[in-house]
């Protein structure tokens, strides 16, 4: 990453990806009660815009305090 890239604005897809990563990173120690509802809402939004029903959540990397979850979406042709 160069100095010029630092000031470059991100595209909407990159911003959405970063936001989704932040949303899906959950603190294990807190055991947030709304995570399951948030997953359902994310699935509903994805289905609204992609018409896909094949959506899976996967745990990617876990350590003592943070669990990272990946969303896999199979898009119909």
UniProtKB/Swiss-Prot annotation:
- Please tell me whether the keyword Disulfide bond is annotated for this protein: no
A Pfam family found in this protein is MinE
Annotated keywords: Cell cycle, Cell division
Which cysteines in this chain are paired by disulphide bridges?
Answer: none
Q: Which GO terms describe its biological process?
A: cell division; regulation of division septum assembly
**Function of this protein?**
Prevents the cell division inhibition by proteins MinC and MinD at internal division sites while permitting inhibition at polar sites. This ensures cell division at the proper site by restricting the formation of a division septum at the midpoint of the long axis of the cell.
Would you identify the family this protein belongs to, as annotated? Belongs to the MinE family.
State the NCBIfam families in the record.
Answer: minE (TIGR01215), PRK00296.1 (NF001422)
Protein name as it appears in the record: Cell division topological specificity factor
Query: What organism does the record attribute this protein to?
Result: Helicobacter acinonychis (strain Sheeba)
Its ancestry begins with:
Bacteria, Pseudomonadati, Campylobacterota, Epsilonproteobacteria, Campylobacterales
């Amino acid at each position: 990453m160069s100095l010029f890239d630092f000031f470059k604005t991100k595209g909407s897809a990159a911003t959405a990806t970063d936001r989704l990563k932040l949303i899906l990173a959950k603190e294990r120690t807190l055991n947030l009660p709304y995570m399951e509802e948030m997953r359902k809402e994310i699935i509903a939004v994805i289905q609204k815009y992609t018409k896909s029903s094949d959506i899976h959540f996967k745990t990617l990397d876990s350590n003592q305090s943070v669990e990272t979850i990946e969303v896999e979406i199979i898009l119909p042709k």
